[in-house]
């Protein structure tokens, strides 16, 4: 009989992750890059900032003009993957899941190893109850960026939902290793819940 895993109240998934720095274009790790391609950048003469940098600054202040500047950055080919990713978060907060999905997938077209885009796409699939695809993207996010703590937490949630309790324990332990002790406490009750579920599962097989 399938078991229903009851999560503690604070075990809801962690939210979307905005890109806060410029990411370099995808490179082949096996190939020495002697001539790195320049990143397209059109500076605003008044502020000295590119469209992406202006958008990010406004976005972090909660200014609605950020959306317009992310679109401008994309048109100018300025940090396209990052701009698409952050625009996707804005669209998600506006309740436009389809547009958010389009933004995150476009980000991955420009940079298939964009950890934040994988993570945010995983969150969209999670909210749509497509836990299989959510798990794939959380796994990709943690693989691309092994220090991406939130990816491990959400991965553990999905793995627990998918009854892969052993893997969930590993992911949650990794999360606790990466965050300060205070933040790691939100995982304690979830760890206990997963351990109990794993024990019940083992006993049922005995």
Label each residue range with its predicted role.
Residues 1-49:
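Long, contiguous interaction/recruitment modules in multidomain scaffold/adaptor proteins
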Residues 41-82, 93:
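Alpha-helical segment of the N-proximal tetratricopeptide repeat
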Residues 47, 80, 114, 148, ...:
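Residue-level recognition of tetratricopeptide repeat
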Residues 52-59, 82-93, 116-126, 150-157, ...:
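Conserved alpha-helical positions within TPR/SEL1-like repeat arrays
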Residues 60-72, 93-106, 127-140, 162-174, ...:
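Structural signature of tandem alpha-helical TPR/SEL1-like repeats
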Residues 76, 110, 144, 178-179:
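Structural marker of alpha-solenoid helical repeat scaffolds
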Residues 180-181, 188-192:
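Intrinsically disordered, low-complexity regions flanking the DNA-binding domain
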């Amino acid at each position: 009989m399938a078991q229903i895993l009851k999560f503690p109240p604070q075990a809801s998934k962690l939210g979307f992750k905005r890109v806060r720095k410029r990411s370099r274009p995808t490179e082949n790790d096996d190939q020495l890059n002697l001539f790195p391609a320049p990143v397209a950048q059109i500076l605003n003469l008044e502020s000295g900032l590119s469209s992406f940098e202006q958008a990010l600054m406004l976005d972090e202040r909660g200014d609605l003009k950020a959306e317009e500047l992310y679109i401008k950055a994309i048109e100018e080919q300025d940090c396209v993957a990052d701009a698409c990713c952050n625009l996707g978060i804005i669209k998600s907060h506006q309740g436009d899941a389809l547009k958010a999905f389009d933004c995150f997938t476009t980000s991955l077209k420009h940079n298939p190893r964009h950890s934040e885009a994988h993570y945010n796409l995983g969150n969209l699939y999670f909210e749509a109850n497509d836990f299989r695809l959510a798990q794939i993207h959380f796994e990709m996010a943690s693989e691309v960026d092994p220090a991406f703590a939130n990816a491990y937490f959400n991965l553990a949630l999905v793995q627990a939902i998918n009854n892969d309790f052993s893997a969930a324990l590993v992911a949650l332990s990794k999360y606790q290793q990466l965050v300060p002790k205070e933040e790691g406490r939100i995982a304690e009750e979830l760890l206990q819940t997963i351990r109990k579920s794993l024990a019940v599962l083992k006993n049922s097989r005995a």
